[in-house]
């Protein structure tokens, strides 16, 4: 009872309502990633690229799996004072996924098209200003210290479902860079299906699982790690930064 009372009196993290403000502007990026199973098995290698096209930025994440599967995600956004998602595309195919799926939506037209296996859907799509499909890691780097954020993502089955999201700091973890200890902030991204569909999901024990991101602290925040599902009802995967491997030098 005392613990409950203390928790009730503890101040909650200040919430950032609406789109996340730009604190660290994005630019040209090219990084390398590895995707592993929860048991640590290497499943895929990936690349993250970001390009600037006028006042729009295009963020692309591609994983090529050992079994031939493909995960190809592209988010186009602007960063005039706040981050604003303008367009999104996602392709998932191959044996690592239950079925081939393709999704695309665009704020300019206000429309979407989606395919999951043999099922297709298209039409008008509600796109809140704080929609962040493909931008979650960027938003977490820009959250003010100690603040929580909220937003939305769209899930497709293939019909669209708007999901509420809460982004908050969960804790801190130590990691090593060489022998030097560093600190990473661990963020929790909570997904919540609103309305009667959310109630039904809770009753059936099918609430969307939480996602976790690790971001290096300091004056220049940097993505370190992701852990969670990358498709509906999928396994828990881990994404981390990867270092290139060099072929053995020939003997001289």
Language-model-detected regions and their locations in the chain:
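Surface-exposed beta-loop interaction hotspot
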Residues: 112-151
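Bacterial N-terminal signal peptides
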Residues: 1-11
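Acidic, serine/threonine-rich low-complexity disordered tracts
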Residues: 17-107, 150-252
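Serine/threonine-rich low-complexity intrinsically disordered regions
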Residues: 2, 128, 144, 193-198
